[in-house]
């Protein structure tokens, strides 16, 4: 299959093989691609407490809506293949992508996004209100399917020879499930996208990074790593415990 030869889903995710997903898209068809994209929250509102742009999923209806009913352009099989790798008319917000990767981490349970977890009283002695978790929908896919995707994303960060995020997470102290992306933008420029969640086998945090004109999906990896470092407290310098001498000020 192209440069990589016969491969499975895990390897395809690890090395970001477009040819694999061209073939997968061809076999699934645009209706299935659209169905699962929508169930995963792409092109849909996240439920955040602000107005938001829903973006859109690449499919024949979006194709006609964007070009007009009188356009001479026709939907073709090539459009299906481009849609399958996130190109053509796919347009998603960073929050949608963060919600999407969180849904992968939750084995298909998509939660509503919120800005505030809780509100505390002015003296921090009382919790005034707490935002309750809300399930938006469940993706119609098996647990095994999500496990395969997770393992491919872990290999993306952990495999020290071929993983597309290996330079930033190959030796990271916490297992990270990650995926790089390099969508083509207008004018021939390439944006960089990076989605990830951690710990891979007991998820707590999901991250989406977009770097406009970033050229390679790897450009988002160090930003995601900095976020994980802060969240997991890995960026704190280890304080050296030195014996205190008489008259020494305590810092």
Show where each model-derived region lies.
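Intrinsically disordered, low-complexity acidic/polar segments
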Residues: 185, 204, 216-218, 234
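Periplasmic/cell-envelope proteins involved in peptidoglycan metabolism and beta-lactam response
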Residues: 31-39, 178, 210, 218-251
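Beta-lactam-recognizing serine transpeptidase/beta-lactamase-like catalytic domain environment
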Residues: 1-208, 247-251
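Short, conserved micro-motifs enriched in small and acidic residues
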Residues: 88-95, 214-222
């Amino acid at each position: 299959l192209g440069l990589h030869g016969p491969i499975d889903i895990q390897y395809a995710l690890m090395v970001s093989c477009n040819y694999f997903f061209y073939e997968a898209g061809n076999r699934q068809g645009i209706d299935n691609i659209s169905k699962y994209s929508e169930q995963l929250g792409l092109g849909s509102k996240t439920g955040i407490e602000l107005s938001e742009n829903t973006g859109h999923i690449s499919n024949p209806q979006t194709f006609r809506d964007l070009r007009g009913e009188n356009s001479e352009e026709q939907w073709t099989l090539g459009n299906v293949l481009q849609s399958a790798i996130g190109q053509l008319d796919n347009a998603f917000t960073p929050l949608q992508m963060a919600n999407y990767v969180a849904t992968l981490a939750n084995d298909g349970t998509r939660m509503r996004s919120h800005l505030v977890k809780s509100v505390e009283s002015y003296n921090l002695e009382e919790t005034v209100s707490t935002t309750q978790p809300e399930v938006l929908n469940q993706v119609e896919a098996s647990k095994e399917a999500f496990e395969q995707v997770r393992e491919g994303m872990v290999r993306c960060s952990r495999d020290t020879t071929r993983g597309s995020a290996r330079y930033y997470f190959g030796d990271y102290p916490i297992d990270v499930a990650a995926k790089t992306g390099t969508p083509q933008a207008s004018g021939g420029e390439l944006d960089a996208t990076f989605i990830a969640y951690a710990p891979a086998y007991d998820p707590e945090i999901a991250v989406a990074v977009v770097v406009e004109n970033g050229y390679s999906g790897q450009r988002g990896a160090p930003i995601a790593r900095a976020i994980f470092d802060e969240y997991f407290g890995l960026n704190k310098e280890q304080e050296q415990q030195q014996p205190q001498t008489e008259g020494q000020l305590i810092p």
